[in-house]
């Protein structure tokens, strides 16, 4: 009987949206089609099973922190990473950032080195907690938002890329200027999603020690502030607090 026509012209019920807790209303509205989509339900089921069998980073309450700390209406910079750190206590939902008290990873150490050369007076902190950037409108987004402990890229191809492409498209739809910072070949493939006439794309090699020669000297942070100021948007204060505690 499944091939019988629907006599009342009614479509099957769409899946109910799965909306993460404490998400800003503008993200909820922009991403509602994603939260309602079958792939997102499948991704949620996959993660539920993964957490039963493996240690998954970041912890569930932190997965959407990039969106929580930076509402869509406040985004003026997007820095795209690939997937979360896969070591203990590192990942907390912001690309390139680690929790207070955790050793600064090599890529972030190189980011600090470039900041020291690029931004007059910048002093590299002893921590790697980038929340103060997020709270200024810097969306620190990974393309994949979860990972198995010790297994880099283990959650690629499970649906996250579809979701984070939708995030990038939502930011691209903004009329006011956003600066997109794309480091490395993986991030640079997302350039095709950025079509807004007011936006600026800054791209270079990845800050990883494996490709640092294509990153050092590119001055992405001063270029970002110049682009923002030309559009009448305030610059980012890249200097991080000397001491931090996780809230």
UniProtKB/Swiss-Prot annotation:
Give the EC number(s) under which this enzyme is classified: 3.2.2.27
InterPro entries membership: UDG_fam1, Ura-DNA_Glyclase_AS, Uracil-DNA_glycosylase-like, Uracil-DNA_glycosylase-like_sf
Active-site feature positions: 83
Protein keywords: Cytoplasm, DNA damage, DNA repair, Hydrolase
Catalytic reaction annotation: Hydrolyzes single-stranded DNA or mismatched double-stranded DNA and polynucleotides, releasing free uracil
Q: What is its main location?
A: cytoplasm
Q: What's an example of a GO molecular-function annotation for this chain?
A: uracil DNA N-glycosylase activity
| PROSITE patterns linked | U_DNA_GLYCOSYLASE
Q: Which domain of life is it from?
A: Bacteria
GO BP terms: base-excision repair, AP site formation via deaminated base removal
A GO cellular component entry from the record: cytoplasm
Q: Could you say which enzyme class this protein belongs to?
A: hydrolase
Q: Where in the cell is it found?
A: Cytoplasm
Report the Pfam families cross-referenced here.
UDG
- What role does it play? Excises uracil residues from the DNA which can arise as a result of misincorporation of dUMP residues by DNA polymerase or due to deamination of cytosine.
Q: Which family does it belong to?
A: Belongs to the uracil-DNA glycosylase (UDG) superfamily. UNG family.
UniProt cross-references to HAMAP family, sorted A to Z:
UDG (MF_00148)
Q: What PANTHER family does the record tag this protein with?
A: URACIL-DNA GLYCOSYLASE
This chain's protein is named: Uracil-DNA glycosylase
Q: Which organism is it from?
A: Deinococcus radiodurans (strain ATCC 13939 / DSM 20539 / JCM 16871 / CCUG 27074 / LMG 4051 / NBRC 15346 / NCIMB 9279 / VKM B-1422 / R1)
């Amino acid at each position: 009987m499944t091939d019988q026509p629907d006599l009342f012209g009614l479509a099957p019920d769409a899946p109910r949206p799965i909306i993460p807790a404490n998400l800003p209303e503008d993200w909820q509205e922009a991403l509602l089609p994603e939260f309602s989509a079958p792939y997102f339900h499948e991704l949620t089921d996959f993660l539920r099973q993964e957490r039963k069998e493996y240690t998954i980073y970041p912890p569930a309450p932190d997965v959407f922190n990039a969106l929580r700390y930076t509402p869509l209406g406040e985004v003026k910079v997007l820095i795209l990473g690939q997937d979360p750190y896969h070591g203990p206590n590192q990942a907390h939902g912001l690309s390139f950032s680690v929790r207070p008290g955790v050793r600064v990873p090599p890529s972030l150490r190189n980011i600090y080195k470039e900041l020291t050369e690029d931004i007059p007076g910048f002093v590299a902190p002893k921590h790697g907690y980038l929340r103060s950037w997020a709270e200024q409108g810097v969306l620190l987004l990974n393309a994949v938002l979860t990972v198995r402990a010790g297994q880099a890229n283990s959650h690629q191809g499970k649906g996250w890329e579809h979701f984070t492409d939708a995030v990038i498209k939502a930011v691209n739809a903004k009329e006011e200027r956003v600066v997109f910072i794309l480091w490395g070949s993986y991030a640079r493939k997302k350039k095709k999603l950025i079509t807004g006439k007011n936006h600026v794309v800054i791209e270079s090699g990845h800050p990883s020690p494996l490709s640092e020669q294509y990153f050092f000297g590119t001055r992405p942070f001063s270029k970002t502030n110049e682009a923002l100021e030309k559009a009448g948007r305030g610059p980012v204060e890249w200097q991080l607090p000397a001491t931090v505690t996780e809230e």
